[in-house]
Every structure is written in structure tokens, then in C-alpha cells.
Amino acid sequence: KEWQNYGIALSRTTMANWVIKAAELWLKPLYNLLHQKLLTANCLFVDETTTQVLREPDRKATSNSYMWLYRNSTDVDQQIILYQYSPTRAGENAEKFLSGYTGYIHCDGYEGYNKVKNVTRVGCLAHIRRKFHEGVPKTSTGKKSQCEIGLDYCNALFSIEKEIAHLPPEERLKKRKKKAIPVLKAFWGWVETTNALPSSVLGKALSYAKKQKPYLMNYLLDGECQI
């Protein structure tokens, strides 16, 4: 409308093309530079979420596409957060974006991340905690349920991380090992000895925890890693 006030008629298509061209000329080189910088990080955090795109060629407007997010650790001076659009959730997206990277990647249990090679994968306790939380009774029964016990273990580990969050990575790792390892041993012992129907909420939570154990325990390797 501002252009119209000057007697210049511009279509939405023309203005959209301006934005696209400006992004290609000025923003894409900056994005590529940040991408290169990101791949030098010690730790990366990766996630993907659904989104919908209108008028995408050969796809319905209701089709799910994905926005991938990559960021470095909060311990570094220069924070970098990059988004990448993809019409699919295929693991090849992360594999291509992280090509050449050999550090730690924090991600959930999505098997597509197995496509990323030569990295140390770090699991997410929040996803394990969520599984147990789903089985907590809505009303108190006086005695803690097994899901509540699992939730308590997760909360204890998160409390430790909250206590040591202000420390530099090296000191944080020392405190983490001292405080968290006993809790982790008790937690995994409980996971292995607790019985539940595989189809129950508790059974699914225990199964998920067992599958994620090798990845979750990797947060004990570096103070820059998160739980």
C-alpha cells in the first residue's frame, strides 16, 4: 500500500520474488557461513518438528513437512541456531546437514538419527521422563506407583543438573559424575528388575528407557553435554 501511495502498482508475486532474491544474495551466504561454524562445535542439539506449507508443488496443503533445528551448546560464546526445511522426516536430512561432523549430537529416540555416522549420540532424559509421567495416576492412591518411582529418578537427575548448571564444563562433569552416577545405577537397576506388561504405559516406558540407555549415558563423557 505504501508503494501505491506513490502511484506504483506492485503485485504480491513481484514483492515475493524480491524477498526470495534478497535471501539468495544476502542471507544464504551468511547461513552457509554459520553452518560451517556450527560444524566445528563440540556439542550439537538436533530436533525436528512438523509444519505445513501452502501451495507446495505436487503436495496437498494438509501434508506434513518438517522443520529441522540445529544449535550449539549454551557454554560457547557464539550461539548459533539454524533451521532447515524439508518435505520429509528422513534421516538423510540430518545426515547431509551434519556431513563431516564428529562431535556429540543430542537428539531424541527417532531412529532416523542413526543415519548420522561418526558422531557420539547423546540421549534425552526428558523423553524418558515423559513416558513415566504418562502413567502417573491422576489421583493419589497413597502408595507410589511404579511410574511415579521412575519419575522420581528422572526428577532427581534433573535436580542435579540444575545445581551444577552454573559451573564450567570441566567442573560440571566432575560434580555430575559424583552426584549422578549413584542415582543412575539405582535407576537402571530398578528399570531392569521392574516387571510390566509390554503393552502397558509402564512397560512401554521401561522398554524406551532400556533402548535409550546407551545414548543417555553418554552425557557422562563431556561436561558440555546435557541430560
Would you name each region that the model predicts?
Residues 1-227:
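Catalytic center-proximal scaffold of phosphoryl-transfer enzymes
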